[in-house]
């Protein structure tokens, strides 16, 4: 008896936890309203004033909503104390699990006249527009959008999420509009008070000023239900239900409440496009967890495997240990629990002394049965209650419980510069057959930059084909060159320059039946300097010929490279090469005849010798 008195005393003197939460929210909104009122008194720009008035409307709507909740809860508590007993109330009545409802991508098309849409853009009339969303005790708003005659549709990029929605929810969307070209929009309450003080007499003005400073500013602000100057009016509205949810963009019909002659009027098309999704808690939260024993028949013998089972996301996930869940290990067994699943209690087993139940699923037209057993009857009752609640949640959320829909809860307020774009026309998104959202060019370029790690901006780098002589330097080939003639000595080497000058002599004239062989030798003859361009072309040709010969040798079977012989043994190597080749005698090069000087050419004795 003392316990009952204590409970009654606590319920009467101390408020419930829900009441405290609502009271805290109410106090917060009141403080927000006070701050907005102070901001309104100093606002001078149109957009600042309109944004402040919008926030003030949302605060007032939330205050009214929280006040109504407190009154209703107080009324329920009073009727509960004086009315019928709690045992008379149906405690066994089931309620579907809550869920999340999110709306995003709101686009409302406009239907301008051709004369209005293509008229002078500088003198066009602008409107401030925003949406207020109501679902149960929650109220949210979108960003304020400035609309003029150049826009084809109104776009709101906000993602609004309602975290505690019931299956029979009603989401109400209200579209408010205000004309920005109204001359009275800049008349804030402070300016209006100054004009009123100046319009009356001097003595009366001082008296009015003292009374205005003595009273609180919010008392003056809320003397009328609407703020003077800037005033939003309801332009259109729509109510969404569970049947309106679809995991894609969908077109809905609007109810237009404004009149064409109103200053806040906008030529709405009569429809809107948005993405409305829902996530029931039965697909995201863990409904039940605990140990179960799976029963199997192996070779006519009954065996049991102990699992730690979790009922989540429409599946019964079976793990060996609870630690596997935190380690994100794949479950050892997954049993679907959907609308087509049948669960039956098997009864108490005398051998195992445990209660069992069977889970029956139809796979490819055949019934697949899994038998589980609990440790005690109380555990079995908890599992059966969780299964019945899960089936009830699936039936109440209908098509939303078949597949988990994705909610993008993060929406950047100020996206990066390369992601900003002007809103496209809503007609690209409003498709009856397969509605889809088109991707802009900036999004494609941004994705390409991320995929190629910035190489997309530089451009494709064309890899040129390697030169034929590039294989000489890759280090994968062994080169063996047999030299049949002594190497040409460079005049740049100081050690060999003296020997070259000492051994330099005139070459004998070529035989009459042999063609002359051109051989480039560096020297200081002035005649060589005159033929420098012709020799450069010969050098290029000879270099290409050598490269082709070397590449041809690389294609043959590789031989072990030999160390080059010293210059004294070159002649011996040449003789051995002639003996090995046999009949194939190499053609010896013929030196080029020495060019005659001008004095020798003009000598008459040389003419006589040539005639002989």
Swiss-Prot record:
Q: Where is this region: Disordered?
A: 483-530, 574-612
Instruction: Please verify whether the record's keywords include Coiled coil.
Output: yes
Residue ranges occupied by any REM-1 domain in the UniProt entry: 3-79
Q: Which InterPro entries match?
A: AHD (IPR012966), Cytokinesis/Rho-signaling (IPR051364), HR1_rho-bd (IPR011072), PH-like_dom_sf (IPR011993), PH_domain (IPR001849)
Question: PH domain: which residues?
Answer: 285-392
List keywords of the entry alphabetically. Answer: Coiled coil
Stretches of the chain forming a coiled coil according to its record: none
| Low complexity compositional bias, start-end | 486-498
From the Swiss-Prot or TrEMBL record, give the protein name: Rhotekin-2
Q: Which organism is it from?
A: Xenopus laevis
């Amino acid at each position: 008896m003392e316990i009952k008195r204590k409970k009654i005393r606590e319920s009467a003197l101390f408020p419930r936890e829900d009441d405290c939460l609502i009271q805290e929210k109410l106090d917060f909104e009141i403080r927000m309203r006070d701050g907005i009122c102070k901001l309104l008194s100093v606002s001078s720009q149109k957009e600042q004033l309109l944004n402040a008035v919008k926030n003030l409307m949302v605060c007032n709507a939330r205050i009214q909503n929280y006040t109504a909740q407190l009154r209703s809860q107080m009324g329920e508590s009073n009727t509960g104390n004086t009315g019928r007993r709690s045992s008379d109330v149906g405690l066994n009545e089931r309620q579907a699990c809550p869920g999340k409802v999110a709306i995003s991508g709101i686009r409302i098309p406009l239907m301008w006249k051709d004369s209005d849409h293509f008229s002078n853009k500088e003198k066009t009339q602008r409107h401030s527009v925003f949406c207020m969303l109501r679902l149960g005790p929650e109220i949210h708003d979108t960003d304020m959008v400035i609309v003029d005659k150049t826009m084809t549709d109104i776009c709101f990029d906000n993602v609004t999420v309602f975290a505690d929605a019931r299956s029979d929810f009603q989401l109400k969307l209200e579209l408010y509009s205000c004309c920005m070209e109204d001359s009275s929009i800049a008349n804030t309450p402070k300016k209006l008070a100054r004009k009123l003080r100046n319009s009356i007499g001097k003595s009366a003005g001082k008296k009015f000023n003292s009374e205005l400073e003595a009273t609180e500013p919010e008392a003056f602000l809320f003397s009328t239900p609407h703020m003077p100057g800037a005033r939003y009016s309801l332009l259109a509205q729509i109510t969404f239900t569970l049947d309106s949810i679809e995991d894609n963009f969908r077109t809905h019909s609007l109810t237009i409440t404004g009149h064409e002659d109103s200053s806040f009027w906008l030529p709405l098309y009569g429809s809107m496009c948005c993405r409305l999704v829902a996530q029931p808690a039965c697909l995201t939260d863990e409904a039940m967890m605990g140990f179960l024993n799976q029963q199997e028949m192996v070779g006519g013998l009954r065996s049991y495997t102990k699992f730690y089972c979790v009922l989540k996301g429409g599946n019964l996930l079976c793990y060996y240990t609870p630690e596997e869940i935190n380690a994100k290990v794949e479950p050892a067994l997954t049993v679907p629990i959907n609308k087509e699943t049948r669960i039956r209690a098997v009864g108490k087993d005398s051998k195992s002394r445990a209660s069992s139940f069977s889970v029956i699923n139809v796979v490819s037209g055949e019934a697949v049965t899994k038998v589980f057993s609990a440790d005690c009857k109380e555990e079995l009752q908890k599992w059966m209650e969780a299964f019945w609640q899960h089936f009830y949640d699936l039936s109440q959320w209908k098509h939303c419980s078949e597949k988990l829909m994705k909610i993008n809860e993060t929406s950047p307020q100020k996206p990066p510069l390369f992601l900003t774009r002007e809103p496209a026309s809503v007609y690209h998104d409003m498709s009856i057959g397969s509605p889809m959202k088109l991707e802009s060019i900036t999004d494609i370029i941004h994705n390409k930059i991320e995929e190629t790690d910035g190489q997309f901006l530089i451009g494709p780098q064309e890899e040129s084909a390697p030169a034929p002589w590039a294989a000489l330097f890759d280090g994968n080939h062994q080169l063996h060159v047999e030299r049949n003639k002594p190497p040409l000595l460079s005049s740049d080497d100081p050690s060999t320059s003296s020997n070259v000058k000492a051994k330099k002599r005139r070459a004998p004239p070529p035989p009459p039946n042999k063609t002359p062989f051109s051989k480039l030798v560096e020297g200081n003859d002035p005649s060589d300097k005159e033929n420098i361009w012709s020799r450069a072309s010969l050098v290029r040709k000879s270099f290409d010929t050598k490269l082709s010969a070397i590449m041809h040798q690389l294609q043959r079977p590789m031989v072990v490279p030999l160390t080059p012989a010293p210059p004294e043994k070159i002649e011996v190597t040449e003789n051995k090469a002639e003996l090995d080749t046999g009949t194939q005698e190499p053609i010896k090069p013929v030196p080029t005849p020495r060019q005659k000087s001008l004095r020798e050419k003009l000598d008459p004795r040389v003419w006589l010798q040539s005639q002989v």
